[in-house]
């Protein structure tokens, strides 16, 4: 660990956030603040940037509302900026300048104007997530007053700062234990953002993490609005996630199938265990894993690259210019319980009942099945839809022309049992639109 520098003779005077009011080039401020929110470092038009919100005891207004202050870090280099991934950690800043942006107080931290920062843990009982320094003495309280990350090669620290940190941690633990700190996310706001293709935030619980390769993994999440999401993450950017974590996910967008899109500024933040919001999310969000086995495969590579369209959009607002769509659904049941009704005779114009009878002239025995399905990805859509299965190539090795054969029927019965086991299985299929109906095409049962 780089050595701590001796304190300068003219020591730093730290300001309460509410007392910072004078705006000017010559006015520089030093302060401590508890992190309420933060972006990941990202490249702006000319510089790398981190935006965050901080608070201290002076930020509490009448009624207990927290008036946070925006802090923006600027640098020519990514490495000079703080990576903040926990609500409640503490940031110390030297030489910030005040400006008002959109009528809000903003403290600018310009690393190329000799500004500096340090990050401290907000709870002595929980280790730092990504420490820049090692715990050299091996004690549990090593990071209580030692920053776990800082700008530059070294940091200065004076004796009176120990009390500042101690008091700030005491206040934040009390405030966070009795207040949610971050705003609840509304389902309507998410829907509006997705419609407008803009960013939104989530409060969510990790239900599953699976490795893709040495660089990435896939995470499944249940959120506070009852929706399920998936995301592909870089392990290096978010290395500390584990199953069961409750999180604030900042500034993401999403595709229609609820797969999240993480931009360079998107961030994932944890909460301290004493936080009221942590306890509420932990108990209120389901831990059930919404991962099932796909029992089908799409037979063309080009079709596999198609975006997944929610069933609700297919049936209520489809793209009129397109005929083929890709969708994922769970089969609740077949429209008829009688296995004999699964096969019909089609003469090219209309269907004829078969039921073991002789096939009408110029007619072909085909599957004639109506599947009652629900959307696999979009759990918030509680509607049931009808999908038609009349493609003989869907079940490999089961030919409707052999329907009178007992072995064929037994094989079909087993396949349908798997297909309709919606608790553990789902279908990924290409659907062809025929007026208001959708038929499975270019898809095979595994």
Swiss-Prot record:
Pfam families: POT1, TEBP_OB2-like. Gene3D superfamilies: Nucleic acid-binding proteins (2.40.50.140). Monomer. SUPFAM superfamilies: Nucleic acid-binding proteins. It is found in: Nucleus; Chromosome, Telomere. One of its GO terms (molecular function) is telomerase inhibitor activity. The lineage of its organism: Eukaryota, Sar, Alveolata, Ciliophora, Intramacronucleata. This is Telomere-binding protein 51 kDa subunit. Keywords: Chromosome, DNA-binding, Nucleus, Telomere. It comes from the Eukaryota. Transmembrane segments: none annotated. Belongs to the telombin family. May function as protective capping of the single-stranded telomeric overhang. May also participate in telomere length regulation during DNA replication. Binds specifically to the T4G4-containing extension on the 3'strand and protects this region of the telomere from nuclease digestion and chemical modification. PANTHER family: PROTECTION OF TELOMERES 1 (PTHR14513), PROTECTION OF TELOMERES PROTEIN 1 (PTHR14513:SF0). GO terms for cellular component: nuclear telomere cap complex. GO terms for biological process: regulation of telomere maintenance via telomerase; telomere capping.
